[in-house]
UniProtKB/Swiss-Prot annotation:
NCBIfam families for the chain: tRNA (guanosine(46)-N7)-methyltransferase TrmB
Species of the source: Prochlorococcus marinus (strain NATL1A)
Binding-site residues, substrate: 117, 149
Protein name per its UniProtKB record: tRNA (guanine-N(7)-)-methyltransferase
Enzyme class, spelled out: transferase
Length: 214
């Protein structure tokens, strides 16, 4: 399986109509935690098991991983969790518009593909359009949590969110002031990085009270 896929390739520019929350979940009114780039899904599987009164959605651009995650989820009979194949740059905004305002409580973006070359920066998952889609759906005090073991990438991500007026950084200054995953569950990459004694940079943003305007 390819580690990285180009989200700007023609195939991934085709918009997908994702299932609505009422189709995805038995209890569709529960608050939602959205994990962008859910990889092998262990992070969300553990969260969904621990917190049955939340709904969890994992979005992943690598379709074979989504199939693998869904197989695990069905085996565990987790009805508050779904993994969906999509390119968030193309399909996220429409799906979020189906949610009740404020239902989206948490968004996590953890160890995303770095795309190191400057000419490939536009392939990175986080951008102004995605942030605005999230801001439009999220009410005051909603969370965006990001983490990476690559300093240049976390700096790029924080700069991108800092420029967005709808989110306020919680841990200003030190990129290492959050010493563990705030959701008390680690991703596979997080576990790997800690075993290798790599530095992990974590930043939490809070949706402020500013009303969204186009």
């Amino acid at each position: 399986m390819r580690q990285h896929v180009n989200p700007l390739s023609q195939f991934f520019q085709l918009p997908l109509s994702l299932p609505s929350k009422n189709i995805l979940f038995e209890k569709s009114h529960y608050p939602i935690h959205l994990d962008i780039g859910s990889a092998k899904g262990e992070f969300l599987i553990e969260l969904a098991t621990k917190y049955p009164d939340w709904n969890f959605v994992g979005l992943e651009i690598r379709e074979p991983l989504v199939s693998l995650c869904e197989k695990k989820r069905r085996k565990l009979e987790l009805t508050n969790l779904k993994f969906l194949f999509c390119n968030v740059n193309v399909s996220l905004d429409e799906w979020l518009s189906d949610l009740d305002f404020g239902q989206l409580k948490r968004v996590s973006i953890q160890f995303p593909d770095p795309w190191f070359k400057r000419k490939h920066f536009k392939r990175r998952v986080l951008n102004t359009n995605i942030l605005n889609s999230i801001a439009k759906s999220m009410s005051k005090d909603g969370e965006i949590f990001i983490q990476s073991d690559i300093l240049k990438l976390i700096e790029y991500m924080t700069n991108t969110i800092d420029e967005n007026r709808y989110f306020t950084r919680k841990n200003v200054g030190d990129l290492r002031s959050i010493d563990k995953n705030p959701y008390d569950v680690m991703t596979d990459r997080e576990i790997f990085s800690l075993k290798k004694n790599l530095l992990i940079y974590r930043v939490m943003y809070i949706r402020n009270s500013l009303l969204f305007t186009n």
